[in-house]
Design a protein with these regions (language model features):
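Short beta-strand to alpha-helix junction loop
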Residues: 94-114
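N-terminal Rossmann-like FAD-binding beta1-loop-alpha1 element of flavoenzymes
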Residues: 3-31
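Conserved Rossmann-like nucleotide-cofactor binding loop
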Residues: 14, 37, 164
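Predominantly flavin-linked oxidoreductase catalytic cores and closely associated redox partners
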Residues: 115-211
Length: 211
């Protein structure tokens, strides 16, 4: 008998959501995170798009650690000599159902993983999945880890270990991608007083901006 019905690798939003669905279906689920806690190694920015949360966690906004609600979105298209900016604002986005929110990813990811644990998921942190196990038929049968107690088995492994998934590459599911199809992003978190943020971005209260 396998250790679990399913193993989810990566406790970011995708991994926690997958674990929530499986656990609620009565499956034995392991959610493995290589960081010391969910959100400690997050990569993408702090804007949360709530469509999936609306389906998984009714009235999630009453419990999630949200900083601001997105009421303004701004997109800029630039060339070497020109720039076009499209700016959209609406007060309707500041009320349920929300269009988006800003959050500190360590706080948000921790909260979402806790929802998965409450549903019955086993959360395993500070553990790196180093590879996949295969049964006699060649099918994936679990994962190898850097833990002293070794491997974990399950008939289903869901790789939520990021856009450059090591596990997907190992299984040949992630083909070579031309460098021209990549973009480089830089993320920096700055602390500013609330009144400074409101003044600079033209917002008030718990309104937020996605640029």
């Amino acid at each position: 008998m396998s250790d679990f019905d399913a193993i989810v690798v990566g406790a970011g939003p995708a991994g926690s959501c997958a674990a929530i669905v499986l656990a609620r279906a009565g499956k034995r689920v392991a959610l493995i995170e290589r960081g010391p806690f969910p959100g400690s190694k997050n990569m993408y920015g702090g804007v949360i798009y709530p469509r999936i949360l609306d389906e998984l966690i009714p009235e999630w906004w009453l419990h999630a650690p949200i900083q601001r609600w997105i009421t303004r979105r701004s997109t800029m298209i630039m060339t070497e000599t020109q720039a076009l900016n499209v700016d959209f604002r609406t007060q309707a986005w500041g009320h349920p159902p929300y269009n988006g929110a800003t959050a500190y990813r360590p706080d948000f990811d921790h909260w979402l993983a806790d929802v998965a644990v409450e549903a019955g998921t086993t959360l395993i942190c500070s553990t790196t999945v180093t590879g996949l196990l295969h049964g006699a038929n060649g099918h994936v049968s679990g994962v190898t880890t850097d833990r002293p107690d070794g491997d974990l088995t399950a008939p289903i492994v869901i790789a939520c270990d990021g856009v450059n998934s090591f596990l997907a590459k190992q299984e040949g599911l992630y083909g070579a991608v031309d460098a021209d199809n990549y973009t480089l992003g830089v993320k920096e978190t700055l602390g500013l007083p609330k009144h400074v943020i409101d003044e600079r971005f033209g917002v008030r209260g718990d309104e937020g901006v996605d640029i």
